[in-house]
Amino acid sequence: MAAAELADTQLMLGVGLIEKDTNGEVLWVWCYPSTTATLRNLLLRKCCLTDENKLLHPFVFGQYRRTWFYITIIEVPDSSILKKVTHFSIVLTAKDFNPEKYAAFTRILCRMYLKHGSPVKMMESYIAVLTKGICQSEENGSFLSKDFDARKAYPAGSIKDIVSQFGMETVILHTALMLKKRIVVYHPKIEAVQEFTRTLPALVWHRQDWTILHSYVHLNADELEALQMCTGYVAGFVDLEVSNRPDLYDVFVNLAESEITIAPLAKEAMAMGKLHKEMGQLIVQSAEDPEKSESQVIQDIALKTREIFTNLAPFSEVSADGEKRVLNLEALKQKRFPPATENFLYHLAAAEQMLKI
């Protein structure tokens, strides 16, 4: 097996099964290998089967303490051999961000469970993918890990959609991401939250960092503690109560109302000037061009972002220990940039860990 394939098969961490029975009880039925009580409780919360009178969400995903979770939820048809089960969820945990890959695999596992009513076939398929990167089944479909390149998962969202909703205000999101600030996104529909939040890291394409994404967070003490351990993040919520938690965000996005709010404590670092106006104009111009694809928009923003780092380069020097480049603040001040530009470059250097300690 090729090294790349081997690495890919080692990304999955576990598989689990949650059922809702005819009495309305939701039970963690089975998993392979074992899991912790904390993670089990989290996944029970995420699967939405415990929510009374709420719509089913066919597929949800998120991250908790560097473990990604992917959950497909199925309503059991009357014809199924699962006579005492009304709904069930298949849960996959993994080390990588790749919603399309794990949605495809969980759908196959769901079809297997509907047909056989036993986790045995699911476990066989899980182990086949874990060890060989493939599972084949005539009646349930085939799955091949290498068909789902992680690099395709990154640009899968739509920056054009974000710009059509927020226009020039998109630059606030770009600035917050550049400065590694905390962005909280609210919408009552989890599908809207996930689609929007997964796209945001593409605004800082040079980092290729989707570990900042926490697309489905509950106002739960353990989840919030895990979130607050991160320096900067993009976190999605479906509970409007999060708007009353300014300790959780520097920028709050109310998707339902198309509003972006900068928290008072973040306003100084997020002060906008000529540099931001130019960036905003470029983002809008590129995104509104019908001839340009999503990937071209990402590349346009990435090129302009590189220019910003080029602006910063003349004011950096090798640190005393020779290990990294640090900001020469005096040189930056002598350049006499407009205050907002100087302020932004200083905070960008801080985000890139270029300040002298």
From Swiss-Prot:
PROSITE patterns in the cross-refs: DENN
GO cellular component: late endosome
Annotated function: May be a guanine nucleotide exchange factor (GEF).
Cysteine disulfide partners in this protein: none
Subcellular location: Late endosome
UniProt GO MF annotations: guanyl-nucleotide exchange factor activity; small GTPase binding
GO terms for biological process, alphabetical: protein transport; regulation of early endosome to late endosome transport
Organism: Homo sapiens (Human)
Family, as annotated: Belongs to the DENND10 family.
Protein name: Putative DENN domain-containing protein 10 B
cDENN domain residues: 159-299
Keyword Lipoprotein on entry: no
